[in-house]
Amino acid sequence: MNKKKYIITLAGTVIGLFAIFVFVNYKIQYSELEGIPNYTEIKGNIVIDRFKYEKQPSLGSSEAKVKVVEFADFKCPACKNWTATYFDQFKKDYIDTGKVQLYFMNYAFIDRDSILAASAGEAIYHQSNDKFWDYYKKLYQNQGKESEIWATPKFLLNFVKNEIDGIDYEQFRKDLTEHTYMLDVKEDYKTAGYYGINGTPQFVIDDQVVRISSYEELTRLIDQKITE
């Protein structure tokens, strides 16, 4: 075999092995989601006619003049960036001062493990609103790659056991594995679609979806509402 043919053969072998590796890794990742339903498989009656603030995790005074809803996916890198870069400042300037009450709604659209991560958040929220916000910040800090299946049952159970204290872990485990709050996640998803949410993070200010490209634009719109 001459040198040129050897190089071509070697390159073909490497490409073939890489393709096999990618395929096997893909199969392993998706095997972790066995038994996790997609939205069409989550059954139950859902009526979307308004933002149901009373069903959402919240921060701030119920007497705040402005209500802001954040739609997010726990697998979304931009959502992680928003939380890491702006959340603490937003909380200091608007929530702690009583100007804004912030709500969270799931728009879990990236993959089925997005839905599972969202349902884990719902399970924690139904035990403690405050502990939900611990989960919110810490899960983003431990976020995996968007293109990979990482928010698996095993990961989420271990994560919550090690990182979120002050909840009934056995109740959480039961709710996660039995998909207790999957319908709540689907309701959030349907609400997002009803109001035209098409990405994350996106925000709603006093029932109005706003299209923004920067933190400064978000706070400017909030300031306008405060002074109205």
State where each predicted segment sits.
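Structural alpha/beta surface segment adjacent to cysteine/selenocysteine redox centers
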Residues: 72-74, 80-161, 195-198
